[in-house]
Amino acid sequence: MKGRKLLVDLCCAVICTFVATSAFAQSDAEFTKANQEYAQGRFKEAIDQYEALARSGQWSANLFYDLGNAYFRTGDFGRAILNYERALALERHHPEAVANLQIARDEAHALEMQPSWSERYLQFASINQYSIAAAAGFWVAIFCIVGLVFARRRSAAAIAFSSFSLLVAALSILAVYQLDAGSKGRALAIVTGKEVQARLATADTANSVLTLPPGSEIKILSIRGDWIYAALPNNLRGWILAKDTEQVRL
């Protein structure tokens, strides 16, 4: 019975490996095909291929970077900026995405949200890096505390190290919260419509607060039906039609 169960488990593992390998091979082939469409100047076809990969969950910084380039070549600066931002959300230090993002912003005259002073100081690392630091600090502190509990003599160095590890974990958790809730955090969205008006109320006839060029940044505060209430550049707030924006985080 044990031998039969082992054989079944082995067959399942082989099948799963084969399926996963086939899926990766297929996505690589589709990505290569999309790149070929782009190289041959068929940008709309390349966009369709890249978007299909994104919808299937095959996310990578290079996929969104290439998708941003394709949108840029069609003159859709809003979606170009959106996808450069998505590339940077996955890989913070992507120099090509940083450079092209700035070019697209200049072309579109897009408005940016200004980070708070705490965000500016914390932006040398990403949320993922702070999360890793928090987990590492927490577990190092736990091991030190367990060691102190069972040790015959409590070392001052071990106590200091465990305290330092807990401090690192706490500060890293605070950094994750600040960045996630900040101007570049989970609520960040990009204006994809053209000459979008932020209004005082949820009506097309309401007075305009600010005209937002494509690619402008907003921070979503709440949603009411087809409208989004958002923090805007220049420390303003207003209502925007949801169809004219897309969140950076998927």
Where are these regions (language model features)?
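Boundary regions of SH3-family modules and the immediately adjacent low-complexity/disordered segments
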Residues: 161-193, 200-203, 207, 231-250
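SH3/SH3-like beta-barrel superfamily modules
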Residues: 210-242
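Membrane-embedded alpha-helical segments of integral membrane proteins
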Residues: 110-150
